[in-house]
């Protein structure tokens, strides 16, 4: 997910996307703990980075509102 795409979203949409990604991350981690190998090991890393991007831009938007 690109930062420009995130900046176009509202804070509510960002919150919703964060919840979705955290659920997806939990599912991927559960697969790993069961001993299965992931098709793409970069998935977890990419999800974590997307969450970080979303949180960063959310904070930027909240600062602008003040």
From Swiss-Prot:
One Gene Ontology term of the molecular function aspect: structural constituent of ribosome
GO terms under biological process: translation
InterPro entries named among the record's database cross-references: Ribosomal_uL29, Ribosomal_uL29_CS, Ribosomal_uL29_sf
Organism per entry: Thermococcus onnurineus (strain NA1)
SUPFAM superfamilies reported for this sequence: Ribosomal protein L29 (L29p) (SSF46561)
Keyword Ribonucleoprotein included in the entry's annotation: yes
Classification via Gene3D superfamilies: 1.10.287.310
Keywords recorded for this protein, A-Z: Ribonucleoprotein, Ribosomal protein
Family: Belongs to the universal ribosomal protein uL29 family.
GO cellular component terms attached to this protein's record: ribonucleoprotein complex; ribosome
Pfam family name, one: Ribosomal_L29
Superkingdom in the source lineage: Archaea
Protein name: Large ribosomal subunit protein uL29
């Amino acid at each position: 997910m690109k930062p420009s795409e995130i900046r176009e979203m509202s804070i509510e949409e960002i919150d919703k996307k964060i919840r979705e990604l955290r659920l997806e991350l939990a599912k991927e981690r559960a697969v790993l703990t069961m001993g299965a190998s992931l098709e793409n090991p970069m998935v977890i890393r990419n999800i974590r980075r997307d969450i970080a991007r979303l949180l960063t831009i959310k904070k930027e938007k909240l600062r602008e509102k003040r």
